[in-house]
Amino acid sequence: MNIELITQLASLILIVASGPIVIGLLSLKQGNL
């Protein structure tokens, strides 16, 4: 396994996972659930 591939996969996973988390936190702060 190349270190570059691992870092790219990790960054993609972080970006994909951070999307719903940020939306959830914003909705919790606004109380629009």
From Swiss-Prot:
Compartment list: Plastid, Chloroplast thylakoid membrane
Keywords: Chloroplast, Membrane, Photosynthesis, Photosystem II, Plastid, Thylakoid, Transmembrane, Transmembrane helix
Native organism: Lepocinclis buetschlii
Segments traversing the membrane: 5-25
Keyword Membrane applies: yes
Gene Ontology cellular-component annotations: chloroplast thylakoid membrane; photosystem II
GO biological process, one term: photosynthesis
Annotated protein name in UniProt: Photosystem II reaction center protein Psb30
